[in-house]
Amino acid sequence: MTKQTLTQLEQHDLFLRRHIGPDSNQQQAMLNFVGAESLEDLTAQIVPESIRLSQDLSIGDSCGEAEGIAYIRGLADQNQVFKSYIGMGYYGTQVPNVILRNVFENPGWYTAYTPYQPEIAQGRLEAILNFQQVSMDLTGLDLASASLLDEATAAAEAMALAKRVSKAKKANIFFVADDVFPQTLDVVKTRAECFGFEVVVGPASEAVNYELFGALFQYTNRFGQITDFTELFATLRAKNVIVTVAADIMSLVLLKSPGSMGADVVFGSAQRFGVPMGFGGPHAAFFVARDEHKRSMPGRIIGVSKDARGNRALRMAMQTREQHIRREKANSNICTAQILLANMASFYAVFHGPDGLKTIASRINRFADILAAGLQAKGVSLVNSTWFDTISIKGLDVAAVNARALAAEMNLRFDTDGTVGISLDETTLRTDIDALFDVILGAGHGLDVAALDAQIVSQGSQSIPAALVRQDAILSHPTFNRYQSETEMMRYIKRLESKDLALNYSMISLGSCTMKLNAAVEMLPVSWPEFANMHPFSPLDQAKGYTQLIEELSTWLVNITGYDAVCIQPNSGAQGEYAGLLAIKKYHESRGDAHRNICLIPQSAHGTNPASAQLAGMQVVVTACDKQGNVDLEDLKTKAAEVAENLSCIMITYPSTHGVYEESIREICDIVHQHGGQVYLDGANMNAQVGLTSPGFIGADVSHLNLHKTFAIPHGGGGPGMGPIGVKSHLAPFVAGHVVVKPGRESDHNGAVSAAPYGSAGILPISWMYIKLLGSQGLKKSTQTALLNANYVMKKLSEHYPVLFRGRNDRVAHECIIDLRPLKEASGVTEMDIAKRLNDYGFHAPTMSFPVAGTLMIEPTESESKVELDRFIDAMVSIRAEIAKVESGEWPVDNNPLHNAPHTMADIMDPEFDTRPYSREVAVFPSAAVRTNKFWPTVNRIDDVYGDRNLMCSCAPLSDYE
């Protein structure tokens, strides 16, 4: 028996060995192949010495899964989850267990990527299409997006859309009714300031008194009142005002739709459709508009097209509106959205169906009726005369009521003017109403819930005026009327899941996306009620576990980035960019340099960079790159000097989007600083920095961090994500604040960029666990292994494909770019053909045509083993051999396995397949690996042009189900 010390035996459970794909033998074999003695030797060959850290991170030691779970369990236990009646856009909900287990906790759903490859994403595309159908049915409008980040940012997007499409071109005022949620107004004001819009706040009826391009109303309002806006909206629209409405999704089940009142845009949070509050998120926002505004819609839209066989197929429609194509001219900077949460909400609607939703909404409303009737019977005066779920009260002894509420472990809404609000939800029970009577009235009130209910049944309720009761049918599509049994629902979810390729099947080597392991142990705490069920506006002394977790995570991120402070609020990487640029903007303004509004951006930048700069009110000036893909220093010097007086910042990614560590990065920072600008270092490629270098050490002033890339939050098929920003001390006073929750930061006076003060706090435990489990050495080794895997793949493939960019010592960083343009010229085979052919080999394609058209960018991450890397390499080598057959003329350029990829079961069953110059086996079993573990695309190649020319973004017609 091997003699091992106890210390060595204790290392067996360390998370590090679970997270990193290659074992020690595989690592050594790979090191030998690439020509390095060790990971340290490889690091020295790749990372410029001038920016390498001389000290280790100060995170702590790696630990085992059991130890990590025990620690975070202690944090969770510090949270006191009181019964919440705060409302304000966040409500208790019952997550159906069939959805919790089969979607939220299922890697088949949460590890997929944004469906840029729709042929292997038909399942979640159908689920998202269902979400769009729910959104359109409930709002009464024509076209819905696939989700936005939250209700408040959706409001800001609605304002921007209003300005784009309004015929009142000279108007510069956006009106906001004074009864919207305060966090929504906060985010709208932040965005309006960047655009130079004037925001006027007042009673809804006063909107007609201004020359407006747009207006925003809340339905129902923050106090619970339901208003019929039909006449007001008609008056405003006659004046070319774009009318936008923030709506409660559950109330719309019972209420007249805003679309039928004349609204142009309706948006809101889908949280109460089966998504936990999570101390603020993540939650999907719905966004719906009139068809005439479709080209100005923000975010992703799922549409129906057809595949090569003419069969119905789904895809992301009208992508030319988006940041990755239009850059600074895009409608929005949105990239990551909230697809996983939108899918949960859509499944919630499918599972309950229209009748179930009406029962839930009616029960909520009945409890509100009972509560109101009881209080009014005791002489309590209500602020609102109509309601769906919320009543507001004045004239109470607020201190006494609050004391009784806290003693009963419940939170009410207490406004600064003494108004007390109570919002009921799906989780409300009869006993809760009894307890609320006790809290408001004191003991001995003598009210009986059953008696009050009988009175309401007998006399009727006027809480929803007859004119505002929904008369039209909702969710009549068969999808929402056939899966109400759990057996059927479970099978429907599984049927959709089986159509999608996710990390639980194979590597997803998307460059600049960092599709690493999302370990089960990291995901576990997210479902715990202590984290999942806390309202974001709960008193902070009830959220001590969350507070400590956020403080510890922030401290670790400060250490990892080399910055001085971190702001957790942004809900995505793109929102992080926006928040970071706002901090820069406010910093310049504080120094009397408000005129500094020019943002330098290299040609190779991510599309979100110029889109975010435009969003922050900056002017983009593009700088050139040299033939090696590096920033052209001479061009940068020239342009920095030319715009020096107005230079705000540069946005640069490191390592570069070309996959190399630029030797001149510090000189780039110095050039910008010398001309009075700040350095924004995009954190998209942070997976190649952690433990080896840092943005702060390099010389940057601010960065966002993609927690859904570097720090293990799953991509969810297109969200959630988080984009906290790290800043140097001089920018710390200018990060996002929040109007509702003010934990005493210096930046609290600043506007918000997200609805919740800590963004999507409910998924922060994932990144906390990732860092805690890996520790200082584990984080560093993860980065080094990512470099090893990328260089191994690069060197293997370089024998078959040209590698476009390499850094020092002929190395790449954590990703590499192969150039397909010579092959395309010689054979006619395109990068799209190769991407689709990889589906037949069981792989998602790498990133296509970014940052250079006609290329593939490959990022394997540290979590992939040598076995999986070799399988991918073998597939690419085999595809190269197939291309050679096209080059030689053996296969026609328009009839070969690449041109016809991906192949489906329908292909091999087709009698006409025999006319093809290749066999069925070549088509669907091109490698030995897929013979025993085949992923089958369910549609053939999709016709993108047809889908955009014949736009349809709703569920299939009823005839498809006959």
UniProtKB/Swiss-Prot annotation:
NCBIfam families given in the database record: gcvP, PRK04366.1
Matches recorded under InterPro entries: GcvP, GDC-P_C, GDC-P_N, GDC_P, PyrdxlP-dep_Trfase, PyrdxlP-dep_Trfase_major, PyrdxlP-dep_Trfase_small
Cofactor(s) needed: pyridoxal 5'-phosphate
Alphabetically ordered keywords of this record: Oxidoreductase, Pyridoxal phosphate
Known role: The glycine cleavage system catalyzes the degradation of glycine. The P protein binds the alpha-amino group of glycine through its pyridoxal phosphate cofactor; CO(2) is released and the remaining methylamine moiety is then transferred to the lipoamide cofactor of the H protein.
Catalyzed reaction equations: N(6)-[(R)-lipoyl]-L-lysyl-[glycine-cleavage complex H protein] + glycine + H(+) = N(6)-[(R)-S(8)-aminomethyldihydrolipoyl]-L-lysyl-[glycine-cleavage complex H protein] + CO2
Enzyme nomenclature, EC number: 1.4.4.2
HAMAP family assigned: GcvP
Enzyme class: oxidoreductase
CDD domains linked: GDC-P (cd00613)
Leader sequence residues: none
Protein name: Glycine dehydrogenase (decarboxylating)
Assembly, per entry: The glycine cleavage system is composed of four proteins: P, T, L and H.
Family as reported in the entry's similarity comment: Belongs to the GcvP family.
SUPFAM superfamilies xref list: PLP-dependent transferases
Gene Ontology cellular component annotations, sorted alphabetically: cytosol; glycine cleavage complex
Modified residues (N6-(pyridoxal phosphate)lysine): 709
GO molecular function: glycine binding; glycine dehydrogenase (decarboxylating) activity; pyridoxal phosphate binding
Pfam family, one: GcvP2_C
GO biological-process terms attached to the record: glycine decarboxylation via glycine cleavage system
Organism: Shewanella baltica (strain OS195)
